[in-house]
Regions:
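N-terminal flexible segment immediately upstream of the FAD-binding catalytic core
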Residues: 1-71, 75, 85-116, 145, ...
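C-terminal substrate-binding/cap subdomain adjacent to the FAD-binding core in PCMH-type
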Residues: 155-157, 164-171, 175-390, 423, ...
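Iron-sulfur cluster-binding electron-transfer modules in prokaryotic oxidoreductases
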Residues: 518, 627-967
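N-terminal glycine-rich flavin-associated loop
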Residues: 12, 24, 48-80, 98-144, ...
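Terminal amphipathic helices with adjacent charged low-complexity linkers/tails
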Residues: 271, 305-402, 437, 441-442, ...
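Activity-critical C-terminal alpha-helical subdomain
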Residues: 395, 496-545
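Cysteine-centered iron-sulfur cluster-binding motifs in ferredoxin-type domains/subunits
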Residues: 546-567, 600-624, 857, 884-885
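Non-heme iron-sulfur electron-transfer modules
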Residues: 529, 566-602, 623-649, 936-945
Length: 967
């Protein structure tokens, strides 16, 4: 952790910023204001191709803080920019001034009794909003591709949309009420008559300006017609001036103007949406046409009453994914002009679904197709089809040259012009050197995306991009009357072209809107309204080479939702951004002082607080595991002494674990003698002397026991299983306050015995380890020696993989699956119980409410559903806390860096109902932290299964027959 006080960095700022900082410090704690080089760089990064580094980053937690900050910003004339999840693509969430980041809080919501409306604070993810509506069979209208990662504030501020919502169910069309904070800090609640009346009195001049613009548009039939026509297709270029045509009340106009305003008119503190039906029944078809014209003619025949989505993919799009695992073989044999439509229909029931699929076939009957239309409602087959579409963007990210950026441009055309426009777009791409760029999009909306990968470190490629954009913009606007931005927002990227698309009169009114709402031009200046015609070519983000593990990162931020340290220190995207900067500074030698500062601060903010769980890779479009890079950094930092120590521990593993067990037993004895309060005070005082002393908590385990077979398990001719008790469970037993005080291996042997398995233990068990503890710390040599030692032992006792291997710890099993001989059939507790034991035991469901925690490794092995099945066989009510992912305990980090565990599990206790008295998981160290922060005992799922299962009666009879001495 950096030891430099914030004042060191603050003193270097211009005086206006120093004064602004001092004002904010009266109501924002110092730990939520960042001014150092690392965090301003890291938090300043978003998913766009632009890089601006803020002077200050402030984490805001509620509306009052935003209101007071805006008041101070107005007083000191300081520009501010709002940031939600940072997934926007057009440069609307970057700044070189003050960045306000939503952090903590902002998660309140309410659903109407019938589910037809939902009120949401801006920090809620789009997918979370839909989860709140799931029980009503409804969802929010806007459906951007980033819905699992984007926050409601950004979705609304950008009027973001996706495959299904079109122009009828986007944020603009479904917003009903809003809480808005204006440039002077004033709050307006449009649902509250008193707030509306107060605003009418205090901001009469603003409302009068809105009314004047409304009246001017209404008096000009040509302008009104232009606005209506342009918003018949998707359009996020400029402001939502259709608000002046669609509404007459000035506050209703303001409410709709805020949609798509990108933080330039005010801050959306809460929004209420009208929800839409979420049909459960879906069917998909991938339809191939001989050329683009045929595909676009097919789109013209479809409508949203019949089809919910129709995704267009040109031949280069299909080619980009044809070699990926799971892709259909026939993709490789298609002609170069072939174009595909991926169509989805939805219905309330199977009958309605069948009607719609037949209707699609009828509508497209006369249009030439390469193959007959075949729909599937099977989940796995539909997922295979949609993986083609989802794989397009990652395919480009994976094959681009190191150092290049990724740009996803976003245009829309009137549907009747789509075919010609697409072909002309392709010819422009070829002419400007982007002939390998793919084209895909939401065909029902005439909305196309195309992906470029320029190297903006090369001046000639910047010039190439400039000339390309000039020609594309002219073509979209002048030839086809299209939208330069359909759903990604104007930002900096399209700000210089707003007047080109809208014309002088409409653009003049947009300027008036900006001046009315932001008279000092302090709200996100340079976005939407901008006097700099070259802003889209300035401050282009460098993507310097750093290391092959992370070089493919496109900085989209999709990784961040899974990161346990994201609210404590940094996220995977921020780690990669920082490492790229460090690599560039090392290479150029340009700023040694800055380099040293970044390197020093990164130790805590980047390396030490990385849990290396790898969940970031599961949502990364290009599958980057930032944890692997962290382990590489740890590996490179080790000297010979550290490596020698690791090798010594690996060679003497049995003795080391015996010592740890003894230490844990001593601590447990002291806990029993002193009691929890006194022990806790003593342990806290001891740790205050040095952070190197592990943190003791009341859930610290006692020493474990090595597994021993005390008698015959199973009977003659019974199936065999190899049981490998992990070293962590051999070392760590239950805690004093745990419900079941047996060592885990005893519970495992008990359920295997009930299921009539003959159990085999590996020889020399006490020295065996999967090596994960070494691997996570970057001791790769020691880790490799332990995994190979284990491999040899398991092959021997499983008869070279003939018998399944049961490991009682999920993270260890995950590593074993990655590293061991593929002949071995390896299972962790949940999967083995689900696949092997549930039909061999009788379960009695307990009248209890329990919680389960799906560990990172279980999530990566996609065992979440099996975990639920096992748990629901055991208890009446099962809780899976929605906002709890990786626990952040990360081996020993829960002891050494308890703040990481606390940050990761901040939402655990609030998610547990009062009648939930126990929790279950499948990793001993994770269970320690879960118990501490959930305030209930978490133990292995094995204990629960043992408690509520019995032998099947027929197996009892078999045992009696076997044990009887017949005469």
């Amino acid at each position: 952790m950096s030891t430099r006080p914030a004042d060191t960095d603050i003193s270097k700022l211009p005086s206006a910023y120093r004064n602004f900082y001092s004002a904010c410090r009266h109501f924002i704690p110092e730990e939520r204001i960042y001014s150092d080089p690392l965090r301003t760089l890291a938090f300043g990064t978003d998913a766009s191709v632009y890089r601006l580094t803020p002077k200050l980053v402030i984490k805001v937690r509620n509306s009052d803080e935003v209101s007071r900050i805006l008041g101070s910003a107005s007083q000191h004339h300081i520009p501010v920019t709002f940031r939600a999840a940072g997934t926007s693509l057009s440069g609307q969430a970057v700044t070189d001034s003050v960045l306000l980041v939503l952090a903590g809080g902002w998660g309140n919501y309410s659903v109407s009794p019938d589910g037809e409306a939902i009120s949401l604070e801006p920090g809620i993810l789009g997918s979370e909003a839909n989860s709140y509506l799931k029980s009503y069979s409804r969802k929010i209208g806007p459906d951007p591709a980033s819905i699992n990662h984007a926050m409601i504030g950004g979705i609304a501020a950008n009027n973001a949309s996706g495959m299904c919502c079109g122009t009828t169910d986007n944020s603009y069309k479904t917003v009903t009420e809003m809480k808005i904070i204006f440039h002077d800090g004033t709050m307006l609640d449009t649902a509250d008559p008193a707030s509306r009346a107060a605003f009418n009195a205090s901001h009469r001049q603003l409302l009068s300006s809105v009314e004047r613009i409304r009246d001017e548009i209404a008096a000009d039939n040509g302008l009104s017609a232009l606005i209506s026509r342009k918003f018949k297709i998707k359009n996020t270029t400029g402001y939502s001036i259709n608000a002046f045509v669609d509404h007459s009340d000035p506050i209703d106009i303001i409410k709709h103007l805020m949609i798509g305003s990108e933080g330039t008119l005010g801050f959306i503190a809460e929004i209420t949406f009208r929800t839409i039906i979420d049909h459960a029944h879906k069917s998909s078809a991938l339809i191939f046409f001989p050329d683009m014209d045929s595909a676009c003619r097919a789109v013209m025949q479809l409508d949203r009453e019949t089809v919910s989505a129709a995704e267009l993919m040109d031949r280069l799009s299909l080619k980009s994914v044809e070699d990926k695992p799971g892709m259909p073989a026939y993709l490789k044999n298609l002609d170069e002009k072939v174009t595909a439509l991926l169509v989805e229909v939805r219905g309330e029931n199977h009958s309605q679904l069948e009607q719609k699929t037949q209707q699609v076939k009828k509508l497209l009957g006369e249009i030439p197709k390469l193959f007959p239309i075949t729909f599937t409602d099977k989940k796995e087959e539909s997922e295979a089809l949609w993986n083609i579409r989802k794989g397009l963007f990652p395919a480009v990210g994976n094959v681009r040259r190191v150092g290049t950026s990724v740009i996803i441009e976003d245009v829309a055309f009137p549907l009747e012009r789509l075919a010609d426009a697409t072909l002309e777009l392709r010819s422009i791409m070829v002419r400007h050197g982007y002939g390998d760029a793919i084209i895909f999009g939401h065909a029902l909306d005439g909305n196309l995306h195309f992906v470029l990968a320029p190297d903006f470190t090369q001046p000639q490629e910047v010039a190439q991009y400039e000339s390309f954009m000039q020609e594309v913009c002219a073509m979209v606007v002048n030839t086809y009357s299209g939208s330069l931005k359909a759903e990604h927002g104007t930002g900096r990227n399209m700000a210089p072209f707003v007047e080109l698309e809208w014309g002088a009169q409409a653009y003049r009114l947009m300027r008036q809107i900006k001046e009315t709402f932001d008279p000092q031009s302090l709200l996100n200046p340079g976005v939407i309204i901008c006097d700099n015609p070259a802003i889209y070519l300035e401050n282009l983000k460098p993507m310097p080479q750093a290391h092959e593990i992370i070089d493919k990162c496109i900085e989209c931020g999709f990784c961040e939702i899974n990161c346990p340290s994201r609210s404590l220190t940094s996220s995977p995207r921020q780690r990669i951004t920082t490492q790229r900067q460090i690599a560039a500074l090392r290479r150029t030698g340009a700023d040694p002082v800055r380099l040293q500062r970044l390197e020093e601060d990164y130790v805590y903010w980047g390396e030490q607080t990385c849990a290396t769980d790898g969940l970031c890779a599961t949502t990364c479009p290009v599958s980057i595991n930032t944890g692997d890079y962290t382990k590489y950094l740890r590996f490179t930092s080790h000297g010979e002494l550290a490596n020698a120590t690791a090798r010594f521990i690996a060679r003497n593993f049995s003795g080391v674990t015996t010592m740890i067990r003894s230490g844990l037993n001593l601590a447990d004895l002291m806990h029993k003698l002193l009691g929890t309060p006194l022990m806790l005070r003593m342990a806290t005082g001891t740790r205050s002397l040095s952070s190197a002393i592990p943190l003791w908590t009341p859930w610290m385990p006692q020493g474990g026991q090595s597994a021993r077979l005390t008698g015959q398990t199973g009977g003659r001719g019974k199936p065999k299983v190899v049981y490998f008790p992990s070293c962590v469970c051999r070392t760590m037993g239950p805690a004093l306050n745990d419900r079941d005080h047996r060592p885990l291996n005893q519970a495992v042997l008990a359920i295997l015995d009930k299921a009539d398995y003959t159990v085999i233990l590996p020889e020399n068990l006490d020295k065996l380890c999967c090596g994960m503890a070494f691997d996570s710390k970057g001791f790769f040599e020691a880790a490799e020696s332990k995994i190979r030692e284990l491999e040899k032992a398991l092959l021997a006792c499983s008869n070279n993989g003939e018998y399944p291997v049961f490991c009682d710890t999920s993270p260890c099993l995950y590593r074993m699956r990655q590293m061991l001989d593929k002949r071995l059939a390896l299972y962790e507790p949940v999967e083995f119980i689900h696949d092997y034991l549930m039909d061999r035991l009788v379960f009695r469901r307990l009248p209890e409410t329990i919680a389960i925690h799906v560990t990172c490794s279980s999530a990566k092995m996609q065992l979440g559903e099996k975990f639920k099945v096992v748990a629901t066989a055991c208890a009446d009510k099962v809780i899976v806390p929605a906002k709890v992912g990786c626990c952040g305990f990360a081996g020993n980090k829960g002891f050494d860096l308890p703040e990481l565990n606390a940050a990761a599990l901040a939402e655990l206790k609030p998610s547990l109902p009062g009648d939930c008295t126990s929790g279950y998981s499948n990793s001993r160290t994770c269970e320690i932290g879960l118990s501490q922060h959930g305030s209930i005992s978490y133990q292995s799922i094995v204990y629960l299964v043992d408690r509520c299962s019995e032998k099947r009666p027929e197996r009892v009879e078999d045992e009696l027959l076997e044990s009887t001495n017949w005469v």
